[in-house]
Amino acid sequence: MEFQLTSKYKPTGDQPEAISQLTDGIRQGVPAQVLLGVTGSGKTFTVANVIANVEKPTLVLSHNKTLAAQLYQEMKGFFPNNAVEYYVSYYDYYQPEAYLPTTDTYIEKDLAINEDIDKLRLSAVSALLSGRKDVIVVSSVSCIYGMGGPTALNASIISIRKGQKLDRNEFLRSLVASLYVRNDIDLQRGNFRVKGDTVDIAMAYSDNVLRVAWWDDEIDSIEEVDSVSFHTIETFEEYKIYPANLFVTTKEQTETAIRQIQDDLVEQVAFFKEQGEEIKAQRIKERVEYDMEMIKELGHCSGIENYSRYFDGRQPGERPYCLLDFFPKDYLMVIDESHVTVPQINAMYGGDRARKQNLVEYGFRLPAAFDNRPLRFEEFHEMLHQVIYVSATPADYELREAEGVVVEQIIRPTGLLDPEIEVRPSENQIDDLLEEIVERAARNERVLVTTLTKRMAEELTEYLLSHDVRANYIHSDVATLDRVKIMNDLRAGVFDVLVGFNLLREGLDLPEVSLVAILDADKEGFLRSHRSLTQTAGRAARNVNGKVIMYADTITESMQKTIDETARRRSIQLKYNADHNITPQQIVKAISTSLPTTRTESGTKPAPKPIVLQPQAYIEPEEAAMVADPIVLRMTKEQLQKSIDNTTQLMKQAAKSLDFIQAAQYRDEIVRLQQQLDGK
């Protein structure tokens, strides 16, 4: 099937030329190109047109889940009749296994999986396995992490057709081999049930149920039915059932893996004994032998991913399979906000290796654990065929890779100009900012304020609230779903000012924002670099009254670069508008959640409603000892639930900061609070 781009818009401004240049480059085999597009110039629309022109399966890579979700929704809107998929980490919470030798503390892996995202991941892989060419996968850096290989997953696909001679029990055994679980009572995703000559399969990658009926030993009908009403949605002559999990294996592979694990265990025990490390030798022997027993009896064990090399048949050091292996060789990669995404890819391997070093060195894991990892950057680079780096501020790496093939997109379809930048002294900056906020609020416009620290963001929010300004804050401690709610509330006018730390930059689409205030703009560093300042200033580029105020006592080199580049772009935009008699038009955009949803027969299944975050002053986090407080015993159910929610956020942040001891304490605290709640 061909890509069918659906949009009420036509390419305008710089878009037609950008689309033409990028399309020609791909058709001519150019390996790397840069799309340097200013904020609000319609880079996603340009990329969508290029995809439609070149007809290649495409991986769109973003640096975080929120922006990936936004891109997914946009691509889904542009290509409603094609396979637009979403592939990000399915962990709501993930605390990796770790050992801290300084305190002799071992922390077990702990996680919570989001079933909806797991379904979307399986759907993405299933679309690629199907062989169809009209596939767009929007992904985070999860795409470079290990998973089952294409050969094993292809071997687990069950192909059936109406009229086929097939023993029903043989079919059931195939389902089990593809990791579907029989459950005749509660038909959940990834389960199947048997009623007489009918088998219902709740496919792991879909909201609906596949119903297969037999007449004697022949398949009589294949239907997709609604998972609630069981009304027929569609009938099929033939159908492919894809595995229920991205990690599948055969009995023979398992037996071979166990033999190899046993051999490596003997070798590792001998190594520790030669070093005089009897405790480590005993530890690794007990742990691995227990894991092998679990694999023999149940087919899996806790931490089985650390043995993935054996099941995949890989050699030590050989890269793992990942999502990129499922694309054909001539696929297209689009790296969004490449100045952030590329360094993130580069950093993944080192962090993973550092954590596992202690686990292997102290006898908690075999050296094979090192091979359950993300791709090294050079491995990732080798798997690229053709790539478009998309950014308003491309880094030196992307410019070198493109060898000068840079396509500029400076003109916005709306005629909007880059915002004016004004530098004001930092003395009395808060009072001056307050006046600007009052002026914007009176015009029903919004304001973004960016600070240097989280604490400053929270304290400034508290100050604004005390002066009757409707304000809120956002930073990395705020949960992803809550961030979406906060952004939507800002756009809807629930509050007028959003104060941020390091999240008011790439990809935020807030056309109601007419002022961006950058406090302490002259404090050189990562948050006040040329690229950071340009990205932050770009948040005001979607409003016809857009303006940026930098509060600073001196003009740094980074500030000057941003001011000069903005002035250059404004002059080009002003000339284009004058030549074409264009009056800048305010962007009007509907407010909706940017998180992906899955479809059901009755319509769209919305994302869970997030908790409304109330602005509050900064409070240093307390150690996890809440349950020891006698007041907890007198808490109501609502108060206990709120405490659980707050402690869960602290746990996630501790895990993200690699403070595993604190995260484990928070986890235990949550368990005890939950017990207290259950007893009410």
Q: Where do the protein language model's features map onto the residues?
A:
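Short amphipathic alpha-helical segment within the helicase RecA-like ATPase core
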Residues: 69-77, 97-99, 459-463
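Conserved strand-helix element at the start of the C-terminal RecA-like helicase core
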Residues: 57-69, 86, 280, 440-462
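Conserved pre-motif I regulatory segment
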Residues: 1-34
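Conserved helicase motor
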Residues: 87-98, 109-120, 451-456, 472-488, ...
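Pre-Walker A (Motif I) flank of P-loop NTPase domains
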Residues: 28-34, 56-57, 133-135, 445-446
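Walker A/P-loop
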Residues: 28-50
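Conserved helicase motor "Helicase C" RecA-like lobe of SF1/SF2 P-loop NTPases
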Residues: 151, 453-475, 672
